[in-house]
Amino acid sequence: MSLRVHTLPTLLGAVVRPGCRELLCLLMITVTVGPGASGVCPTACICATDIVSCTNKNLSKVPGNLFRLIKRLDLSYNRIGLLDSEWIPVSFAKLNTLILRHNNITSISTGSFSTTPNLKCLDLSSNKLKTVKNAVFQELKVLEVLLLYNNHISYLDPSAFGGLSQLQKLYLSGNFLTQFPMDLYVGRFKLAELMFLDVSYNRIPSMPMHHINLVPGKQLRGIYLHGNPFVCDCSLYSLLVFWYRRHFSSVMDFKNDYTCRLWSDSRHSRQVLLLQDSFMNCSDSIINGSFRALGFIHEAQVGERLMVHCDSKTGNANTDFIWVGPDNRLLEPDKEMENFYVFHNGSLVIESPRFEDAGVYSCIAMNKQRLLNETVDVTINVSNFTVSRSHAHEAFNTAFTTLAACVASIVLVLLYLYLTPCPCKCKTKRQKNMLHQSNAHSSILSPGPASDASADERKAGAGKRVVFLEPLKDTAAGQNGKVRLFPSEAVIAEGILKSTRGKSDSDSVNSVFSDTPFVAST
């Protein structure tokens, strides 16, 4: 495929013109280095522009001659066993999706993904991973989706997902985890953008009830726990009931998959549904748990009174309410506070909202009888309705003015096109004037007065015009007494004849401009 350099001048000199040598030289150099730069499609793969699929080809490593600018690489159903710093021989700067499911991957080393820094989706599902060690994904700064389901993972290092600041979805279903990965939400390596965590069908017997309240409400909504062998407990029951009442899809969609083991004695147990009425009489028992939820977003106007209700599911009986403002100020019932008031039923009133009052307010509902409390985060936005209304009014006026101008223009155009600009009387006078002018032309161009001709003659010769011009004798020698017209008069006569004659006037035109003597009769 490549060409030797010393043969290039000979080819260029023999075939190509001097003006095209540089262009052909550039093209031939491109052909020479092309395969090394762009890569080819390996025989074990299927390539489609920026997508390469090498599935079920018994591969143990990534082919080295792949196109480096691919965006999606599928290596599933192969026998790749170890991910180290050299398992990908080249750098894929634009690769955003890497699929490695159904391989024999047993471990991942630090630096395994240094050649794929821009991955957004990594699929390592259905492999043989047992542990995820510290910071093995730290190079993947923009990773958004990580799939690790259907492995043998029994331990997650607290720093295993350190550096994944953009991670939004993490799938850990179908593994051997025995503890809920609380480090994903609290601590040094927490993932602030994680909105979906699937730890279903693991081996988790209980939940850390005293720490689950630290998880923000927006992240709680995306935790899936179904299919785990929970031990029946009123705290867990209350947590799931709270999520169910708040219509969390993680509980609503998998209601019948939440079960627990109820021990009748030390040897025998049975599986029962967690989300059922009168479960273990938990509605009246002491729970000693804390829960957190994300409340509504309220819009307030500057200076207009706003009331916000505490959307707690603990019930109002034996429940006390307090609010915590954005500045961590405590707002309690029966206490005079500037611009704020809290009722005993948990409602918060802001008498005259200001811009600085906007933020997240936390309502804490505490049930003393059951030692149960819930925190509901409510967002309050404050805006100036007068300013926004004036801007909207100005926009409406501008739009209305533009529309009115367009309609007026269309009406004027229609009037100009379809309405007669001159009245009928004016039109009659104009037709009479045109008739007089036509008679005048006829009198000039006809051999005699128009009144002398009979009606039949006028009718027969209505479409013809004859021009009688005074012939001038040319005194120059050689003309034999012939007469001719001046060039300027010939042009004038020709213009008159062309504008007034029909197809039948060709004979009279020829007679006028012939070389035969023209004799005017008296």
Curated annotation (Swiss-Prot):
Does the keyword Nucleus belong to this entry?
Answer: yes
- Positions of region (Disordered): 501-522
- UniProt repeat feature LRR, residue ranges: 69-90, 94-115, 118-139, 142-163, 166-187, 193-214
Q: Which residues form the LRRCT domain?
A: 228-284
Q: Which segments constitute the LRRNT domain?
A: 40-68
Protein name from the UniProt record: Amphoterin-induced protein 2
Provide the tissue specificity.
Highest levels in breast, ovary, cervix, and uterus. Lower levels in lung, colon, and rectum. Differentially expressed in 56% of thyroid, 57% of pancreatic and 45% of stomach cancers.
Subunit annotation: Binds itself as well as AMIGO1 and AMIGO3.
Q: Which UniProt keywords apply?
A: Cell adhesion, Cell membrane, Disulfide bond, Glycoprotein, Immunoglobulin domain, Leucine-rich repeat, Membrane, Nucleus, Repeat, Signal, Transmembrane, Transmembrane helix
**SS bond list:** C41-C47, C45-C54, C232-C260, C234-C282, C310-C363
What membrane topology is given?
Single-pass type I membrane protein
Q: Where primarily located?
A: membrane
Residues covered by the Ig-like C2-type domain: 289-379
Regarding protein family, the annotation reads: Belongs to the immunoglobulin superfamily. AMIGO family.
Work out whether the entry's keyword set contains Membrane: yes
Signal sequence, renumbered to the chain: 1-39
Q: Which residues lie on this side of the membrane: Extracellular?
A: 40-398
Q: Could you provide one GO biological process annotation from this protein's UniProt record?
A: negative regulation of programmed cell death
Name the source organism.
Answer: Homo sapiens (Human)
Name any GO cellular component annotation.
nucleus
Q: Which residues are glycosylated?
A: N58, N104, N281, N288, N345, N373, N381, N384
